[in-house]
Amino acid sequence: MELPKPQTVQQLSDKLTVPVEDLLLPCRFCNSFLTYIELREFDYKNLQLIWTQEDFVFACCSSCAYASAQYECQQFYELTVFGREIEQVEQQTIGLIVIRCQYCLKCLDLIEKLDICCSHQAFHKVRGNWKGRCRHCKAIE
């Protein structure tokens, strides 16, 4: 039985017994190698490594993550709800709804979700998935 492939940068580092700072992980979209900061951001955003059938592994650099998020919002936008309306639409509490940042693709934590709800800001449904603004992108906007 084949062992599951690592899904995070840290898991890949552990499996290969190579420090994260020594990993050379290419971006799936632009083929540039991710910097150390981007490798750490990749896991912080709760993104998953991309494996090919030939067992090549790829990640996504920050620039391509922003570009991909923007493209998805422009091409696959479905609807917008404000604040707690998302719970009515999804029939779930906010803590159980998976929401990613509409700009950088970071998976939002509960505090970020509640902040959007309490300030009655927008959640957007894009390609069947919910998007909002993370604390980092909110701070620079």
UniProtKB/Swiss-Prot annotation:
Belongs to the papillomaviridae E6 protein family. GO terms for cellular component: host cell cytoplasm; host cell nucleus. GO terms for biological process: DNA-templated transcription; regulation of DNA-templated transcription; symbiont-mediated perturbation of host apoptosis; symbiont-mediated perturbation of host ubiquitin-like protein modification; symbiont-mediated suppression of host innate immune response; symbiont-mediated suppression of host type I interferon-mediated signaling pathway. One of its GO terms (molecular function) is DNA binding. Plays a major role in the induction and maintenance of cellular transformation. E6 associates with host UBE3A/E6-AP ubiquitin-protein ligase and modulates its activity. Protects host keratinocytes from apoptosis by mediating the degradation of host BAK1. May also inhibit host immune response. This is Protein E6. InterPro entries: E6 (IPR001334), E6_sf (IPR038575). It is found in: Host cytoplasm; Host nucleus. SUPFAM superfamilies: E6 C-terminal domain-like. Forms homodimers. Interacts with ubiquitin-protein ligase UBE3A/E6-AP; this interaction stimulates UBE3A ubiquitin activity. Interacts with host BAK1. Its main location: host cell. Keywords: Activator, DNA-binding, Early protein, Host cytoplasm, Host nucleus, Host-virus interaction, Inhibition of host innate immune response by virus, Metal-binding, Modulation of host cell apoptosis by virus, Transcription, Transcription regulation, Viral immunoevasion, Zinc, Zinc-finger. A zinc finger (unnamed) spans 27-64, 101-137. Disulfide bonds: none annotated.
